[in-house]
Amino acid sequence: MNNMINIEVEKIIDPTPASDGAGVKLKRSIGVEPNYYDPFLMLDEFGSENKDDYIAGFPPHPHRGIETVTYMLAGSFEHKDSTGGQGKMTAGDVQWMKTGSGIIHSEMPAMNDGKLHGFQLWINMPASEKMSKPEYHYIDSDKMSTHKDKDKFIKVIAGKFKNSEGPIKKHNVDPIYFDVELNESKTFNHQVPSTHNSFIYLIKGEIEIGNNKHESVKDSPLILLSKGE
């Protein structure tokens, strides 16, 4: 335990307003600057209560050699792809897609109005897997492992926290993907392998990381972390 290194804030990135698909408005925090944060290629937050910001969706488009991870917090999207994979995502659901040698898919709102909110993360695939067969994994919120105590509630999408293990396993980068809700003035600790690049996306509130408190961290910033354990 004495050899453990505290993880500290390396950089704070304010998301850039952008649009994608057929005009869906979003905030992009990875994929704007030229710096490559291996293996992460892009991170978008999409969210609005105005249907005009999302109703046109993401019509059929191709991907190759990457993984896309979509996590819904509110609203619903319907996915269809060229492998025959399809599913309707609602709040709390996750879609993890390995595009491999290539796939064409669409993501369209399955709602006419109301609040839509979620995230999409792109992960680079290693050269040895870029021509692999595409895979589509739909993970229902009810099947997600969770951890709850008096201080926090954690949804484990990938990786392991205490006795809760995420459904994404046997992955080339051993991903850790948690949705963490902390009660006020409480603490979250987790060991991250020193080989991992890691980040926090603060959806709401204020957090203290390592030995430094960042009073100005608000409005959905991306917080890149130093390597440690």
Segments predicted by a language model, with ranges:
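Extended, compositionally biased flexible segments
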Residues: 46-113
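Short, conserved beta-strand element in jelly-roll/cupin
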Residues: 62-77, 122-126, 177-183, 195-209
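Short acidic-glycine-tyrosine-enriched beta hairpin
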Residues: 80-98, 187, 192-193, 198-201, ...
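Generic beta-strand structural signal
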Residues: 87, 93, 105, 117-119, ...
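Ligand-binding loop in jelly-roll beta-barrel domains
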Residues: 100-129, 214-216, 226-229
